[in-house]
Each structure stands twice: as C-alpha cells, then as structure tokens.
C-alpha cells in the first residue's frame, strides 16, 4: 500500500512503519524515503492514520496496549477476518475501519473491499476513502460480505496470474518468445478488464462479440467449457472461503 500511495503522489516522508525485523525494515524504508520506527508505539505517536497490517492472531497482542494512545487516531485495518465488531472488542471507543486490499494496490490498480460499518466520523471516513481511492477502486460492502468481496478481489489475482502463465505457455508452445508471450497475455487481460469497466457490458456479451459462427474462438470456448473452467473458478473461491 505504501508503494501505491507513493506512486500516487503521497509524500513518502509522511509515512512511517515498524516491523519485527528492524534491520530489514530500515532498508525497505530507506529505499522509499519513509521513516523506520522501532515499535508500534513510535508509529502511533507519529501518525494520524495507523494501518493495521499484522497477522490476525497478533492483533490483540499488538493493539490492546495501544488503546489509550489511539484515542485521537484512525485505525485502518487490512487484517483478514477482522471486521468492525471484532475491532470494537479490542479497541472500544477508537475510530477504526476494516478493509481488504489486493496486491495491485502497489501500482494504483487495486480493488479495496471496505466495510460500510465503522466507528469513523463522516470527516474521517471521507479522508480514509480518499486515501484508499488513490490505490484503485473502493467497493463498500456490508459486514457479512466484506470477506467475500475481499476473497474475490484479494485471492483471485493468484488465479488470474495462473491463467496468464498458462496462456503464456500456450503462446510459447506455438513459437512466441516467453517475454513477448507474457506481454501479449497481460495486456490482453488489462484491455479486456478496462473494456468491461468502461462499457459495463456483460462478460457473456463480450465473449459472444469475439465468437464468429464456426470460428476459432468458439472452439476454444467449448474446450474451456469441456475442461470445467467456470466450475473450477467457482470452486476456487469456495475453497478460499472455507
């Protein structure tokens, strides 16, 4: 997220971080022009918005002792399975909001699932949503759907990367150099996504627009149907939500 904010024009000097391995943290922060802090207490003291990017099982241990110091701060959670209700148990009375970003936020093309329920004031929420909007598309969801949206947006990049790799392999099989194969496939995925977002067209209609009667594309579509592509993708999401 820090890389995405820096790319979007947020001053690196306005950001700081802490981590378990301080030496490695210093190196990464220096590369970006950020400040490295020795512990979470330093981060909270230096910040207005505190991004909670720790493993879910560590949250209570890390944040409960910081409750008083966080009284006039905003906690922006990116922790999996930690919704507003859970945070309120650990930090009652503290302003907090739960989100699930994905890896493309680092290039400002991410999707961030954002829980509608929060303890933020209207002004605080507007500030946070403005910051998140610099990283990509923000989708506000009910609490019951936050981690469903987070799963589709956050886990599916791995599935798309597998598809890019497989299509790249197919191109290489038929003679395209590897680097060119990935350029072709990745740009195709990017362009197709942009077309759908720009037009709002149903994906099925987009597919039909490419399929000529008796043509090559419809034969490929049938091959994918025979291989169970749709079912495999649905099952992948089902598995991640179990």
Where are each of the predicted segments found?
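NAD(P)+-binding Rossmann beta1-loop-alpha1 motif at the extreme N-terminus of oxidoreductases
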Residues: 1-38, 110, 172-174
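Short acidic capping loops at alpha-helix termini that bridge into adjacent secondary structure
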Residues: 12-15, 39, 72-73, 179-180
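Small-residue helix-packing motif on alpha-helices
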Residues: 15, 43, 177-184, 206, ...
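Rossmann-like NAD(P)(H) cofactor-binding subdomain of soluble oxidoreductases
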Residues: 22, 31-32, 39-114
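Short acidic-hydrophobic, aromatic-tinged amphipathic segments that line or gate anion-handling sites
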Residues: 35-40, 139-141
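Internal alpha-helical scaffold of NAD(P)-dependent oxidoreductase catalytic cores
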Residues: 86, 90-95, 111-148, 160-198
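NAD(P)-dependent Rossmann-like dehydrogenase/reductase catalytic/cofactor-binding core
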Residues: 186-242
């Amino acid at each position: 997220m820090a890389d995405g904010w820096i790319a979007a024009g947020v001053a690196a000097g306005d950001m700081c971080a802490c981590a378990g391995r301080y030496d490695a943290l210093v190196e990464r922060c220096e590369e970006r022009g950020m400040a490295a802090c020795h512990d979470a207490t330093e981060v909270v003291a230096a910040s207005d918005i505190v991004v909670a990017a720790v493993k879910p099982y560590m949250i209570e241990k890390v944040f409960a002792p910081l409750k008083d110091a966080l009284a006039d701060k905003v906690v922006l959670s990116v922790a999996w399975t930690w919704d507003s209700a859970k945070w309120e148990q650990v930090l009652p009375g503290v302003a907090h909001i739960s989100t699930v970003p994905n890896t493309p936020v680092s290039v400002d093309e991410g999707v961030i699932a954002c829980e509608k329920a929060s303890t933020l004031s209207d002004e605080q929420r507007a500030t946070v949503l403005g910051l998140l909007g610099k990283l990509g598309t923000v989708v506000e969801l009910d609490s019951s759907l936050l981690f469903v949206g987070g799963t589709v947006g956050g886990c599916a990049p791995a599935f798309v990367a597998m598809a890019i790799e497989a299509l790249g392999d197919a191109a290489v099989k038929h003679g395209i150099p590897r680097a060119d194969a990935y350029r072709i496939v990745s740009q195709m995925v990017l362009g197709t996504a942009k077309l759908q977002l720009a037009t709002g067209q149903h994906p099925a209609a987009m597919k039909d627009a490419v399929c000529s009667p008796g043509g090559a594309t419809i034969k490929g579509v049938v091959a994918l149907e025979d291989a169970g592509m749709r079912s495999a993708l649905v099952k992948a999401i089902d598995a991640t939500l179990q």
